[in-house]
Amino acid sequence: MNTLQKGFTLIELMIVIAIVGILAAVALPAYQDYTARAQVSEAILLAEGQKSAVTEYYLNHGKWPENNTSAGVASPPSDIKGKYVKEVEVKNGVVTATMLSSGVNNEIKGKKLSLWARRENGSVKWFCGQPVTRTDDDTVADAKDGKEIDTKHLPSTCRDNFDAK
């Protein structure tokens, strides 16, 4: 006697569930990295908005601005903020963006990135990367304090070392 089979067998369903689980295991980390990179891009965008004011101050005064007020940008630094960015601070000509400690990807909570410039052949050349501090008009030093954004979350245009030239 022939019976008509309808639906899927238990083995077929288990195989499909296993495949979906494997795909999710691969896709989830990629999605997490994508969201972190998107959130970091907001920090870069806000920090880059301060470059022209810092450059103008340097070209007019021959030294880097000490803080947000002298650079002519919003002060206190917490006035420059975004959905994922806590503040953007100008300190001795280094523009540092700090991510929020909640509401952002876990891997970038409270982390920082910096934009800094050097005088080069009569113009000002900007760099972007991990947090730095300016030691004098021409030198910056690595400011590693455990608050660096993992390089994989930085765009390729923002991976300069503190000693970049």
Swiss-Prot record:
Ranges of compositional bias, category Basic and acidic residues: 137-153
BP GO terms, sorted: cell adhesion
Sequence positions bearing O-(2-cholinephosphoryl)serine: S75
Gene3D superfamilies recorded: Glycoprotein, Type 4 Pilin
One term under GO cellular component: membrane
S-S bridge residues: C128-C158
Modification Phosphoserine occurs at: S75
Modification sites for O-(2-aminoethylphosphoryl)serine: S75
A Pfam family recorded for this sequence: Pilin
Main location: other
Topology class, membrane: Single-pass membrane protein
Modification sites for N-methylphenylalanine: F8
Loss of function: phenotype: Deletion mutants show a complete absence of observable pili.
Propeptide positions: 1-7
In-chain residues carrying the UniProt-annotated modification O-(sn-1-glycerophosphoryl)serine: S101
PANTHER family noted in UniProt: GENERAL SECRETION PATHWAY PROTEIN G (PTHR30093), PREPILIN PEPTIDASE-DEPENDENT PROTEIN D (PTHR30093:SF34)
Name of the protein this chain belongs to: Type IV major pilin protein PilE1
Organism of provenance: Neisseria gonorrhoeae
